[in-house]
From Swiss-Prot:
Belongs to the TrpA family. Disulfide bonds: none annotated. Pfam families: Trp_syntA (PF00290). Transmembrane segments: none annotated. The active site is at E59 (proton acceptor), D70 (proton acceptor). It comes from Methanosarcina mazei (strain ATCC BAA-159 / DSM 3647 / Goe1 / Go1 / JCM 11833 / OCM 88). Its EC number is 4.2.1.20. GO terms for molecular function: tryptophan synthase activity. GO terms for cellular component: cytosol. This is Tryptophan synthase alpha chain. PANTHER family: TRYPTOPHAN SYNTHASE ALPHA CHAIN, CHLOROPLASTIC, TRYPTOPHAN SYNTHASE, ALPHA CHAIN.
Length: 271
């Protein structure tokens, strides 16, 4: 057990990763996958493939039966993970055992966190080598207990900002959030789209902060990643495009690595 914990603690924090990338004038590729999809063993290889392809940070989804912010691709991924027997204890064991040296971010919903116990969830997440939490269905005004727990255990609490987010709420998010700010490039649920919304640049300009800004909800190609990087984003977040490859089930790891390289290359070319 002590050996496992030493390996976990070597993972960099989110802020350390962004500092490293900023020195190299690179944007962060943040890849999302559902833990346990399609199986526990295969999911571990999926995470390795993303890291090998150039993912700088990996969002590790924990499935929930009512995922209000997820599009159909990620909803089905959650169903597959639940069918495999994913639960919170197995999720933390899975995260702890991952052989990757990039920051891990847990993305889930508030219901399972609340039912498990906020303090216990945050403590166990930290022990599993997780660096941050994204819980899209909890408003910043109601996240005091979660923020306290995250601060106590050295985790970043990452909030979402959408085009409809008010200036007052953005100010609160910038006061209480850390790690990076998750900017929603389009309204609605997650999913790959044919183009990146024109409101992305305007949204970036509204969020005045030294906290890194990452744009998600609709990016699936290197060209789109370059567009977002040119608009001023510190990172791009890609989920559905990766999860769709997993769902298709053909040459999964090779295709994931290839797409990650394409996305990372797009951002590098935008410098």
């Amino acid at each position: 057990m002590k050996t496992e914990l030493k390996a976990v603690l070597k993972r960099p924090k989110i802020s350390e990763k962004f500092d490293e990338l900023r020195e190299k004038k690179e944007g962060a590729l943040i890849g999302y996958v559902m833990a346990g999809d399609p199986t526990f063993e295969a999911s571990s290889e999926v995470v390795k493939a993303l890291a090998k392809g150039g993912a700088d940070i990996i969002e590790l989804g924990f499935p929930f039966s009512d995922p209000v912010a997820d599009g159909p691709t990620i909803q089905v991924a959650g169903q597959r993970a639940l069918a495999e027997g994913m639960d919170i204890e197995r999720y933390f064991a899975f995260a702890r055992a991952l052989e990757v040296d990039v920051p891990l971010v847990c993305m889930t919903y508030y219901n399972p966190v609340f039912r498990y116990g906020v303090e216990k969830f945050v403590e166990n997440a930290a022990e599993a080598g997780i660096s941050g939490l994204i819980i899209p269905d909890i408003p910043v005004e109601e996240a005091a207990d979660l923020k306290t727990g995250c601060d106590a255990h050295g985790l970043d609490l990452i909030f979402l900002v959408a085009p409809t987010t008010t200036e007052a709420r953005i100010r609160k998010i910038l006061q209480r959030g850390s790690g990076f700010i998750y900017l929603v490039s389009r309204l609605g649920v997650t999913g790959a789209r044919d183009d990146v919304a024109g409101s992305t640049k305007e949204l970036l300009s509204r969020v005045n902060t030294d906290i890194p800004k990452a744009v998600g909800f609709g990016i699936s190609t290197g060209e789109q990643a370059a567009e977002v990087r040119k608009a001023g984003a510190d990172g791009v977040i890609v989920g559905s495009a990766f999860v769709r490859i997993i769902e298709e089930g053909t040459d999964v790891n090779e295709r994931l690595e290839t797409l990650a390289r394409e996305l990372k290359s797009g951002m590098l070319e935008a410098n």
